[in-house]
């Protein structure tokens, strides 16, 4: 999807917009401060697969709200607000959340 499509055609109900926007901003913050992956086992806030726990919880909630379309939209938003590398880490972090496959 292009930037304009994302701007004018949101993959979530309008009544969920505040929650979705808050969750996206939280993911951006996680990406910039903690990253979505870690290289060290046992890092607080990360699971045994070294994926960020809260980011996975957010992914599950986004899946409940708007499914794969919303998760893809969110990844594009994270990429626009951070870097390609960070968005790729999110892609792997979300593996097996809903229908998401890295």
Task: Give the role of each language-model region.
Residues 32-48, 68:
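Charged, low-complexity interaction regions
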Residues 73-102:
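Amphipathic alpha-helical binding modules
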């Amino acid at each position: 999807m292009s930037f304009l499509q994302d701007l004018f055609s949101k993959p979530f109900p309008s009544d969920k917009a505040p929650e979705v926007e808050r969750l996206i901003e939280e993911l951006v913050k996680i990406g910039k401060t903690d990253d979505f992956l870690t290289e060290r086992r046992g890092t607080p806030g990360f699971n045994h697969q070294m994926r960020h726990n809260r980011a996975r919880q957010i992914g599950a909630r986004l899946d409940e709200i708007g499914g794969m379309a919303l998760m893809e939209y969110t990844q594009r938003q994270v990429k626009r607000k951070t870097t390609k590398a960070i968005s790729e880490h999110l892609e792997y972090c979300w593996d097996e959340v809903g229908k998401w496959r890295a």
